[in-house]
């Protein structure tokens, strides 16, 4: 049986290999790259509509870190100025399910739903 990190890497690879929709950008995985995959984050310019579509199709999504770090109350005093790319990305990010019990076959099925979006 795969350990949790191996399982998440396998699921992440399934997502990355099967998501093929220009409206939803998945991370690019290089070679045998491995990480812990605490989250599998994609980008969708129309995030709210995408999340609604996923929900209607039975796939839960989440938004982690919706507020960019420079806009967090504890950092306001630092006056970072405008960070338009950071703010745009914060408005686009969506986390897909990756933790157990999600399997590679589940990820491929979810990718199919994403590809029909």
Model-derived regions, located:
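PLP-dependent aminotransferase class I/II
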Residues: 1-117
């Amino acid at each position: 049986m795969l350990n949790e990190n191996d399982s998440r890497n396998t699921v992440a690879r399934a997502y990355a290999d099967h998501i093929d929709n220009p409206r939803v950008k998945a991370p690019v995985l290089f070679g045998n790259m491995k990480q812990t995959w605490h989250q599998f984050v994609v980008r969708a310019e129309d995030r709210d509509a995408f999340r609604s579509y996923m929900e209607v199709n039975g796939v839960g999504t989440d938004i982690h870190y919706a507020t960019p770090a420079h806009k967090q109350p504890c950092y306001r005093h630092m006056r970072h100025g405008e960070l338009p790319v950071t703010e745009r990305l914060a408005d686009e990010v969506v986390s897909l399910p990756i933790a157990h019990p999600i399997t590679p076959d589940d990820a491929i099925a979810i990718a199919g739903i994403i590809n029909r979006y």
